[in-house]
């Protein structure tokens, strides 16, 4: 019945010449859509639309960018708020239902048109756009760098007795350096290098945990580089979704720690040698 009513309504509009808004090429151009922006900001949101709306005006200060918000929660109020807030021609809403970051970040990377992609969390906060400009400069200075982290720059610890791997000691020094791995967020991606050499975030680590370490290890073995700088982020919340999912997080840490070990324990020396050579 609803479809029939809608069909009649549209037929009347067409016959009478009334429409919601007249479209034209000029009105489309006036939207200011950028086909190839320098930067794509990707924000993963899990029922934290207020936090996302807080940082949107800050992200818009960097003009040559697009914004993709992943609405990965389960509450309709957040979907409505985000849809209302994303008003620009280069602002998009990607809807998912509790799939978590492994899947949704990978989807968003394929949607993004930016040369450099910043993967962000819904509790990230920052001042100004200096962290963006610095990241772009670092990518331009290091054409083999596929990943740039702005949070932690870490070694990967391999526990041979337990056959597990996880984030290890900090390797971050100075204003910038190459490191074994970085964790989110932000995590910057050189999109062209990612698509040519890495192709995807490893789905075996879904729904979350340690896929960022795996991606970094794979990058080094592909002859690419992973860098770190201090983005100066701070948190808007007391803890992310893991605060309420401790058992789930522990389960994922055990499972993915074993997988990370299986994949890269035998490659640890080669990876670390490439990090040392890059920093030389």
Residue ranges and their predicted role:
Residues 2-57:
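N-proximal low-complexity "stem/linker" segments adjacent to membrane-targeting elements
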Residues 102, 169-191:
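A recurrent flexible, glycine/aromatic-enriched loop bordering the glycosyltransferase active site
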Residues 57-66:
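Short, acidic, metal-binding catalytic loop of nucleotide-sugar glycosyltransferases
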Residues 95-112:
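Glycine-rich, basic loop-to-helix element that forms the pyrophosphate-binding segment
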Residues 129-162:
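Conserved donor NDP-sugar-binding/catalytic core segment of glycosyltransferases
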Residues 117:
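Short aromatic/hydrophobic "clamp" motif used to bind/position activated sugar donors
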Residues 70-80:
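A conserved acidic beta->alpha catalytic loop
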Residues 187, 192-197, 204-232:
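A short, conserved alpha-helix in the catalytic core of glycosyltransferases
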